[in-house]
Protein backbone atom coordinates (compact mmCIF):
# COMPACT_ATOMS: atom_id res chain seq x y z
CA UNK A 1 0.00 0.00 0.00
CA UNK A 2 1.56 3.24 -1.14
CA UNK A 3 -0.12 6.18 0.57
CA UNK A 4 1.36 9.63 0.16
CA UNK A 5 1.37 12.64 2.44
CA UNK A 6 -1.91 14.45 2.51
CA UNK A 7 -4.44 16.63 3.52
CA UNK A 8 8.29 30.53 -18.29
CA UNK A 9 6.87 32.02 -20.71
CA UNK A 10 3.50 32.31 -22.35
CA UNK A 11 1.25 29.53 -23.51
CA UNK A 12 2.01 28.52 -27.10
CA UNK A 13 -1.26 28.35 -28.95
CA UNK A 14 -1.98 25.73 -31.61
CA UNK A 15 -3.02 28.30 -34.19
CA UNK A 16 -3.72 31.96 -34.77
CA UNK A 17 -7.12 33.36 -33.89
CA UNK A 18 -7.45 34.91 -37.32
CA UNK A 19 -8.01 38.43 -38.56
CA UNK A 20 -10.46 39.17 -35.76
CA UNK A 21 -7.74 39.10 -33.09
CA UNK A 22 -5.32 41.61 -31.71
CA UNK A 23 -2.39 41.46 -29.33
CA UNK A 24 -3.33 43.19 -26.04
CA UNK A 25 0.03 42.35 -24.48
CA UNK A 26 3.12 40.68 -25.87
CA UNK A 27 2.15 37.08 -26.59
CA UNK A 28 -1.52 37.50 -25.55
CA UNK A 29 -4.00 37.43 -28.45
CA UNK A 30 -7.60 38.46 -27.79
CA UNK A 31 -10.56 39.10 -30.12
CA UNK A 32 -10.99 42.63 -31.48
CA UNK A 33 -14.21 44.55 -30.84
CA UNK A 34 -16.04 41.72 -29.05
CA UNK A 35 -19.65 42.09 -27.97
CA UNK A 36 -19.67 43.26 -24.34
CA UNK A 37 -21.89 41.16 -22.07
CA UNK A 38 -22.91 42.80 -18.82
CA UNK A 39 -22.86 39.52 -16.93
CA UNK A 40 -20.45 36.96 -15.57
CA UNK A 41 -19.77 33.86 -17.66
CA UNK A 42 -21.53 30.64 -16.72
CA UNK A 43 -18.72 28.18 -16.15
CA UNK A 44 -18.36 24.69 -14.71
CA UNK A 45 -16.91 24.13 -12.24
CA UNK A 46 -17.90 27.53 -10.88
CA UNK A 47 -14.62 29.12 -9.79
CA UNK A 48 -15.92 32.70 -9.69
CA UNK A 49 -14.63 34.45 -6.56
CA UNK A 50 -13.06 31.37 -4.99
CA UNK A 51 -9.98 31.35 -2.75
CA UNK A 52 -7.26 28.85 -3.62
CA UNK A 53 -3.82 27.82 -2.33
CA UNK A 54 -0.89 28.75 -4.54
CA UNK A 55 -0.12 25.08 -5.13
CA UNK A 56 -3.55 24.07 -6.43
CA UNK A 57 -3.84 22.29 -9.78
CA UNK A 58 -5.01 24.40 -12.74
CA UNK A 59 -8.63 25.48 -12.41
CA UNK A 60 -9.69 24.34 -15.86
CA UNK A 61 -13.33 24.93 -16.75
CA UNK A 62 -16.02 24.68 -19.41
CA UNK A 63 -18.40 27.41 -20.53
CA UNK A 64 -22.00 26.29 -20.01
CA UNK A 65 -23.33 27.28 -23.43
CA UNK A 66 -24.21 24.68 -26.07
CA UNK A 67 -23.70 27.28 -28.81
CA UNK A 68 -20.11 28.04 -27.77
CA UNK A 69 -17.66 27.20 -30.56
CA UNK A 70 -14.44 28.36 -28.93
CA UNK A 71 -13.26 29.84 -25.65
CA UNK A 72 -10.43 32.33 -25.09
CA UNK A 73 -9.44 32.93 -21.46
CA UNK A 74 -6.83 35.37 -20.17
CA UNK A 75 -5.66 35.23 -16.53
CA UNK A 76 -3.74 38.23 -15.19
CA UNK A 77 -2.05 38.42 -11.80
CA UNK A 78 -2.63 41.47 -9.60
CA UNK A 79 1.11 41.54 -8.86
CA UNK A 80 2.73 40.22 -12.02
CA UNK A 81 2.30 37.80 -14.88
CA UNK A 82 -0.44 36.47 -17.12
CA UNK A 83 -1.34 33.35 -19.07
CA UNK A 84 -3.86 32.34 -21.70
CA UNK A 85 -5.85 29.33 -22.87
CA UNK A 86 -7.74 29.03 -26.16
CA UNK A 87 -9.76 26.08 -27.39
CA UNK A 88 -12.90 24.11 -26.62
CA UNK A 89 -12.51 24.88 -22.91
CA UNK A 90 -10.11 26.60 -20.51
CA UNK A 91 -7.17 24.21 -20.20
CA UNK A 92 -4.19 25.95 -18.61
CA UNK A 93 -0.59 24.83 -18.90
CA UNK A 94 0.26 23.36 -15.50
CA UNK A 95 3.77 24.83 -15.23
CA UNK A 96 2.65 28.32 -16.25
CA UNK A 97 -0.29 28.07 -13.88
CA UNK A 98 1.88 27.20 -10.87
CA UNK A 99 4.37 29.92 -11.78
CA UNK A 100 1.63 32.56 -11.99
CA UNK A 101 0.05 31.57 -8.66
CA UNK A 102 3.42 31.49 -6.90
CA UNK A 103 4.06 35.05 -8.12
CA UNK A 104 0.66 36.24 -6.87
CA UNK A 105 0.37 34.54 -3.50
CA UNK A 106 -1.72 36.81 -1.29
CA UNK A 107 -3.05 38.62 -4.36
CA UNK A 108 -5.71 38.07 -7.00
CA UNK A 109 -6.04 36.64 -10.48
CA UNK A 110 -8.29 38.54 -12.88
CA UNK A 111 -9.98 36.17 -15.33
CA UNK A 112 -11.34 37.45 -18.66
CA UNK A 113 -13.49 35.07 -20.70
CA UNK A 114 -14.24 35.44 -24.41
CA UNK A 115 -16.70 33.05 -26.09
CA UNK A 116 -17.16 32.59 -29.84
CA UNK A 117 -20.69 31.80 -31.05
CA UNK A 118 -21.65 31.71 -34.75
CA UNK A 119 -18.45 33.48 -35.69
CA UNK A 120 -18.94 36.35 -33.23
CA UNK A 121 -16.97 36.88 -30.02
CA UNK A 122 -18.52 37.94 -26.70
CA UNK A 123 -16.51 39.26 -23.75
CA UNK A 124 -18.01 38.61 -20.31
CA UNK A 125 -17.45 40.52 -17.10
CA UNK A 126 -14.14 39.76 -15.43
CA UNK A 127 -14.05 37.74 -12.24
CA UNK A 128 -11.38 37.23 -9.60
CA UNK A 129 -9.74 34.19 -8.09
CA UNK A 130 -8.06 34.93 -4.77
CA UNK A 131 -4.68 33.32 -4.07
CA UNK A 132 -4.46 32.72 -0.33
CA UNK A 133 -1.38 33.78 1.63
CA UNK A 134 -1.73 30.50 3.54
CA UNK A 135 0.14 27.60 2.03
CA UNK A 136 -1.42 24.18 1.64
CA UNK A 137 1.58 21.95 2.23
CA UNK A 138 -0.38 18.71 2.40
CA UNK A 139 0.28 16.46 -0.59
CA UNK A 140 -3.35 15.77 -1.35
CA UNK A 141 -6.58 14.21 -0.16
CA UNK A 142 -7.92 10.70 0.35
CA UNK A 143 -11.55 9.81 -0.19
CA UNK A 144 -13.94 7.00 -0.90
CA UNK A 145 -15.59 7.00 -4.31
CA UNK A 146 -18.88 5.20 -4.78
CA UNK A 147 -21.84 5.89 -7.07
CA UNK A 148 -25.02 7.06 -5.29
CA UNK A 149 -26.90 3.96 -4.30
CA UNK A 150 -28.99 2.27 -1.69
CA UNK A 151 -28.69 -1.45 -1.02
CA UNK A 152 -26.57 -2.65 -3.93
CA UNK A 153 -23.25 -1.20 -5.08
CA UNK A 154 -20.64 -2.12 -7.66
CA UNK A 155 -17.06 -0.95 -7.79
CA UNK A 156 -15.88 1.32 -5.01
CA UNK A 157 -12.57 2.16 -3.44
CA UNK A 158 -10.42 4.48 -1.37
CA UNK A 159 -8.30 6.78 -3.49
CA UNK A 160 -5.70 9.51 -3.13
CA UNK A 161 -5.43 12.62 -5.28
CA UNK A 162 -2.47 14.98 -5.65
CA UNK A 163 -3.90 18.49 -5.22
CA UNK A 164 -1.14 20.16 -7.25
CA UNK A 165 -1.99 18.16 -10.37
CA UNK A 166 -4.56 15.59 -11.46
CA UNK A 167 -2.76 12.41 -10.38
CA UNK A 168 -5.09 9.90 -8.74
CA UNK A 169 -4.17 6.44 -7.50
CA UNK A 170 -6.11 3.73 -5.72
CA UNK A 171 -5.23 2.82 -2.14
CA UNK A 172 -7.61 -0.13 -2.11
CA UNK A 173 -10.55 -1.13 -4.31
CA UNK A 174 -13.22 -3.67 -3.51
CA UNK A 175 -12.16 -5.66 -6.56
CA UNK A 176 -9.48 -6.95 -4.19
CA UNK A 177 -12.23 -8.07 -1.80
CA UNK A 178 -15.36 -8.78 -3.89
CA UNK A 179 -18.61 -7.79 -2.21
CA UNK A 180 -16.85 -5.79 0.50
CA UNK A 181 -17.59 -2.19 1.43
CA UNK A 182 -14.60 -0.01 2.31
CA UNK A 183 -15.16 2.97 4.57
CA UNK A 184 -14.02 5.19 7.40
CA UNK A 185 -10.35 5.65 6.49
CA UNK A 186 -8.30 7.81 8.85
CA UNK A 187 -4.65 8.84 8.99
CA UNK A 188 -2.92 10.23 12.07
CA UNK A 189 -2.94 14.04 11.68
CA UNK A 190 -2.69 13.64 7.87
CA UNK A 191 0.36 11.33 8.22
CA UNK A 192 -0.20 8.14 6.21
CA UNK A 193 2.48 6.26 8.15
CA UNK A 194 -0.38 5.48 10.52
CA UNK A 195 -3.59 4.58 8.79
CA UNK A 196 -6.74 2.64 9.57
CA UNK A 197 -9.96 1.76 7.81
CA UNK A 198 -12.81 -0.71 8.09
CA UNK A 199 -14.02 -3.31 5.61
CA UNK A 200 -17.65 -4.37 5.91
CA UNK A 201 -19.10 -7.60 4.59
CA UNK A 202 -18.83 -11.35 5.09
CA UNK A 203 -15.05 -11.14 5.29
CA UNK A 204 -15.00 -7.79 7.07
CA UNK A 205 -12.15 -6.62 9.25
CA UNK A 206 -10.40 -3.47 10.43
CA UNK A 207 -6.95 -2.61 9.10
CA UNK A 208 -4.42 -0.87 11.35
CA UNK A 209 -1.28 0.08 9.43
CA UNK A 210 1.74 1.56 11.23
CA UNK A 211 5.01 2.31 9.47
CA UNK A 212 4.41 -0.41 6.91
CA UNK A 213 3.28 -3.04 9.42
CA UNK A 214 -0.32 -4.10 8.91
CA UNK A 215 -2.69 -5.71 11.34
CA UNK A 216 -6.12 -7.03 10.41
CA UNK A 217 -8.53 -7.11 13.34
CA UNK A 218 -11.60 -9.31 13.59
CA UNK A 219 -14.70 -7.31 12.77
CA UNK A 220 -16.51 -8.28 15.97
CA UNK A 221 -15.68 -9.80 19.32
CA UNK A 222 -17.43 -10.58 22.57
CA UNK A 223 -16.57 -7.19 24.11
CA UNK A 224 -18.16 -5.10 21.36
CA UNK A 225 -21.69 -4.71 20.02
CA UNK A 226 -20.49 -4.44 16.44
CA UNK A 227 -17.55 -3.70 14.20
CA UNK A 228 -14.79 -1.14 14.73
CA UNK A 229 -16.23 1.63 12.56
CA UNK A 230 -15.43 5.34 13.04
CA UNK A 231 -11.74 5.79 14.03
CA UNK A 232 -9.47 8.62 15.18
CA UNK A 233 -5.81 8.42 16.17
CA UNK A 234 -4.27 9.70 19.37
CA UNK A 235 -1.55 12.23 18.41
CA UNK A 236 1.10 10.00 20.01
CA UNK A 237 0.14 7.19 17.66
CA UNK A 238 -0.05 4.78 20.60
CA UNK A 239 -3.83 4.64 20.66
CA UNK A 240 -6.73 4.79 18.24
CA UNK A 241 -10.31 5.51 19.28
CA UNK A 242 -13.17 3.72 17.55
CA UNK A 243 -16.90 3.54 17.77
CA UNK A 244 -18.73 0.26 17.43
CA UNK A 245 -22.06 0.68 15.68
CA UNK A 246 -25.11 -1.41 14.91
CA UNK A 247 -26.24 0.48 11.82
CA UNK A 248 -29.41 0.14 9.76
CA UNK A 249 -30.89 1.82 6.71
CA UNK A 250 -34.50 2.57 5.81
CA UNK A 251 -36.32 4.32 2.98
CA UNK A 252 -38.50 7.37 3.51
CA UNK A 253 -42.03 7.48 2.12
CA UNK A 254 -42.23 11.27 2.04
CA UNK A 255 -41.33 13.84 -0.59
CA UNK A 256 -37.73 15.06 -0.89
CA UNK A 257 -36.34 12.49 1.57
CA UNK A 258 -34.76 9.27 0.33
CA UNK A 259 -32.87 7.33 2.97
CA UNK A 260 -32.38 7.33 6.70
CA UNK A 261 -29.28 5.69 8.17
CA UNK A 262 -29.38 5.23 11.93
CA UNK A 263 -27.78 3.33 14.78
CA UNK A 264 -29.67 1.07 17.14
CA UNK A 265 -26.63 0.71 19.36
CA UNK A 266 -23.21 2.35 19.49
CA UNK A 267 -20.36 2.69 21.97
CA UNK A 268 -16.92 4.29 22.06
CA UNK A 269 -13.65 2.63 23.07
CA UNK A 270 -9.89 2.91 22.50
CA UNK A 271 -7.59 0.35 20.93
CA UNK A 272 -3.91 0.11 21.87
CA UNK A 273 -2.08 -1.56 18.94
CA UNK A 274 1.16 -2.42 20.69
CA UNK A 275 -0.25 -4.84 23.29
CA UNK A 276 -3.36 -5.49 21.12
CA UNK A 277 -5.70 -4.41 23.90
CA UNK A 278 -9.09 -2.74 24.06
CA UNK A 279 -9.57 0.03 26.63
CA UNK A 280 -13.22 0.05 27.69
CA UNK A 281 -15.06 2.34 30.08
CA UNK A 282 -18.67 2.15 31.22
CA UNK A 283 -19.05 5.94 30.80
CA UNK A 284 -18.61 5.46 27.06
CA UNK A 285 -20.69 2.29 26.75
CA UNK A 286 -24.05 3.14 28.31
CA UNK A 287 -27.28 1.29 27.61
CA UNK A 288 -29.49 4.38 27.48
CA UNK A 289 -27.28 6.44 25.13
CA UNK A 290 -25.67 6.11 21.72
CA UNK A 291 -22.00 7.15 21.78
CA UNK A 292 -20.22 7.60 18.44
CA UNK A 293 -17.68 9.61 16.37
CA UNK A 294 -14.77 9.73 18.88
CA UNK A 295 -11.88 12.16 18.27
CA UNK A 296 -8.85 13.07 20.37
CA UNK A 297 -7.83 16.64 21.14
CA UNK A 298 -4.52 17.77 19.58
CA UNK A 299 -2.75 17.46 22.95
CA UNK A 300 -4.18 13.97 23.46
CA UNK A 301 -5.61 14.79 26.89
CA UNK A 302 -9.28 14.81 25.90
CA UNK A 303 -11.54 12.48 23.95
CA UNK A 304 -14.48 14.19 22.27
CA UNK A 305 -17.46 12.18 21.05
CA UNK A 306 -21.15 12.48 20.17
CA UNK A 307 -23.91 11.21 22.43
CA UNK A 308 -27.69 10.90 22.10
CA UNK A 309 -30.36 9.33 24.23
CA UNK A 310 -31.45 5.96 22.88
CA UNK A 311 -34.88 6.20 21.25
CA UNK A 312 -37.32 3.58 19.96
CA UNK A 313 -37.04 2.80 16.25
CA UNK A 314 -38.90 3.58 14.05
CA UNK A 315 -41.30 5.72 16.11
CA UNK A 316 -38.63 7.87 17.74
CA UNK A 317 -36.02 8.21 15.00
CA UNK A 318 -36.50 11.98 14.73
CA UNK A 319 -35.85 12.30 18.48
CA UNK A 320 -32.29 11.01 18.10
CA UNK A 321 -30.28 14.21 18.55
CA UNK A 322 -26.58 14.14 19.38
CA UNK A 323 -24.62 16.50 21.62
CA UNK A 324 -20.84 16.87 21.59
CA UNK A 325 -19.28 15.61 24.82
CA UNK A 326 -15.81 15.11 26.25
CA UNK A 327 -13.95 12.96 28.75
CA UNK A 328 -10.38 13.16 30.00
CA UNK A 329 -7.74 10.70 28.80
CA UNK A 330 -4.33 9.93 30.31
CA UNK A 331 -1.99 8.63 27.62
CA UNK A 332 0.59 7.56 30.20
CA UNK A 333 -1.80 5.12 31.88
CA UNK A 334 -4.36 4.58 29.13
CA UNK A 335 -7.19 5.50 31.48
CA UNK A 336 -10.20 7.75 31.06
CA UNK A 337 -11.38 10.44 33.44
CA UNK A 338 -14.33 9.89 35.76
CA UNK A 339 -16.72 12.46 34.28
CA UNK A 340 -18.39 13.18 30.93
CA UNK A 341 -19.15 16.81 30.12
CA UNK A 342 -21.27 18.28 27.33
CA UNK A 343 -19.43 21.01 25.42
CA UNK A 344 -22.12 21.70 22.81
CA UNK A 345 -25.79 21.01 23.49
CA UNK A 346 -27.43 20.67 20.10
CA UNK A 347 -30.55 19.05 21.55
CA UNK A 348 -31.43 22.34 23.27
CA UNK A 349 -31.49 23.91 19.80
CA UNK A 350 -33.65 21.10 18.45
CA UNK A 351 -30.71 19.87 16.38
CA UNK A 352 -28.17 17.06 16.18
CA UNK A 353 -24.38 17.64 16.14
CA UNK A 354 -22.13 15.00 14.58
CA UNK A 355 -18.72 14.56 12.92
CA UNK A 356 -16.63 16.62 15.39
CA UNK A 357 -13.13 17.35 14.09
CA UNK A 358 -10.73 19.46 16.20
CA UNK A 359 -8.31 21.72 14.35
CA UNK A 360 -4.73 20.60 14.90
CA UNK A 361 -3.83 23.95 16.48
CA UNK A 362 -6.41 23.28 19.22
CA UNK A 363 -8.52 26.36 18.49
CA UNK A 364 -11.71 24.96 16.98
CA UNK A 365 -13.95 21.96 16.63
CA UNK A 366 -15.73 21.69 13.30
CA UNK A 367 -18.92 19.65 13.27
CA UNK A 368 -22.02 18.99 11.19
CA UNK A 369 -25.43 20.19 12.34
CA UNK A 370 -28.65 18.58 11.12
CA UNK A 371 -32.22 18.25 12.33
CA UNK A 372 -31.73 14.78 13.81
CA UNK A 373 -29.75 11.55 13.54
CA UNK A 374 -26.13 10.56 13.06
CA UNK A 375 -25.86 10.33 9.27
CA UNK A 376 -26.31 13.86 7.90
CA UNK A 377 -25.09 13.10 4.37
CA UNK A 378 -28.73 12.32 3.50
CA UNK A 379 -30.04 15.48 5.20
CA UNK A 380 -30.47 18.43 2.86
CA UNK A 381 -30.53 20.83 5.82
CA UNK A 382 -27.12 19.71 7.11
CA UNK A 383 -24.52 22.47 7.52
CA UNK A 384 -21.02 22.62 8.96
CA UNK A 385 -20.45 24.65 12.13
CA UNK A 386 -17.42 25.91 14.00
CA UNK A 387 -17.06 25.76 17.79
CA UNK A 388 -14.45 28.16 19.18
CA UNK A 389 -12.85 26.37 22.13
CA UNK A 390 -11.60 29.66 23.59
CA UNK A 391 -14.91 31.51 23.61
CA UNK A 392 -17.12 28.37 23.71
CA UNK A 393 -19.27 30.00 21.02
CA UNK A 394 -20.49 28.06 17.97
CA UNK A 395 -21.61 29.43 14.62
CA UNK A 396 -22.53 28.12 11.17
CA UNK A 397 -19.82 28.48 8.54
CA UNK A 398 -22.08 30.50 6.28
CA UNK A 399 -19.37 31.33 3.73
CA UNK A 400 -18.78 27.63 3.05
CA UNK A 401 -22.28 26.21 3.52
CA UNK A 402 -24.90 25.85 0.81
CA UNK A 403 -28.63 25.22 0.42
CA UNK A 404 -27.93 21.51 0.02
CA UNK A 405 -26.10 18.97 2.16
CA UNK A 406 -22.73 20.03 3.61
CA UNK A 407 -21.17 17.35 5.74
CA UNK A 408 -18.04 15.29 6.44
CA UNK A 409 -14.87 17.35 6.78
CA UNK A 410 -11.23 17.32 7.86
CA UNK A 411 -8.44 19.82 8.53
CA UNK A 412 -5.12 20.42 6.84
CA UNK A 413 -2.05 19.93 8.99
CA UNK A 414 -1.61 23.68 9.63
CA UNK A 415 -5.36 24.17 10.34
CA UNK A 416 -5.73 26.93 7.71
CA UNK A 417 -7.52 24.73 5.19
CA UNK A 418 -10.23 22.13 5.39
CA UNK A 419 -11.84 19.73 2.96
CA UNK A 420 -15.54 18.98 3.23
CA UNK A 421 -18.25 17.16 1.33
CA UNK A 422 -21.27 18.78 -0.28
CA UNK A 423 -24.16 17.90 -2.57
CA UNK A 424 -24.55 21.48 -3.76
CA UNK A 425 -23.73 20.44 -7.32
CA UNK A 426 -26.77 18.36 -8.19
CA UNK A 427 -28.25 17.09 -4.92
CA UNK A 428 -27.18 13.50 -5.61
CA UNK A 429 -23.41 13.21 -5.87
CA UNK A 430 -21.24 14.12 -2.90
CA UNK A 431 -18.16 16.03 -4.04
CA UNK A 432 -15.11 17.42 -2.25
CA UNK A 433 -14.62 21.15 -1.67
CA UNK A 434 -11.74 23.11 -0.15
CA UNK A 435 -12.05 26.19 2.04
CA UNK A 436 -9.62 28.45 3.86
CA UNK A 437 -9.80 29.88 7.38
CA UNK A 438 -7.63 32.79 8.50
CA UNK A 439 -6.10 33.59 11.89
CA UNK A 440 -9.28 35.41 12.96
CA UNK A 441 -11.59 32.54 12.08
CA UNK A 442 -12.93 34.04 8.86
CA UNK A 443 -13.85 31.31 6.37
Predicted regions and their residues:
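Multi-bladed beta-propeller domains
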Residues: 32-46, 79-96, 164-181, 209-227, ...
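Short, conserved, GDST-rich strand-edge loop motifs in beta-rich repeat architectures
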Residues: 138-152, 242-264, 305-322, 367-381, ...
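Residue-level detector of Asp-centered blade-edge/turn motifs that repeat once per structural unit
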Residues: 189-191, 235-236, 298-299, 360-361, ...
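Hydrophobic beta-strand positions that form the internal "hydrophobic ladder"
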Residues: 194-195, 237-240, 300-303, 365, ...
Amino acid sequence: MNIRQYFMGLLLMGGMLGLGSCMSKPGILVPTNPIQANQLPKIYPDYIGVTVPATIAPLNFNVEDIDAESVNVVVEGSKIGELQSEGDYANFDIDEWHHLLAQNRGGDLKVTVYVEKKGNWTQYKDFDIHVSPYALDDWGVTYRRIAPGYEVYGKLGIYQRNLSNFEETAILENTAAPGACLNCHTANRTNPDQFTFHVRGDHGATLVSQNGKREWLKAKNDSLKGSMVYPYWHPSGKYCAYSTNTTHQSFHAVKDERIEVFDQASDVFVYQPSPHELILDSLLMTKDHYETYPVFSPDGKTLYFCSSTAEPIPSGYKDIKYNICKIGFDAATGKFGNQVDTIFNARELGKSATHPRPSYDGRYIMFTMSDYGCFPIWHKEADNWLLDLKTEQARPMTAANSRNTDSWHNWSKDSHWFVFTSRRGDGLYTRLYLACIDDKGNV
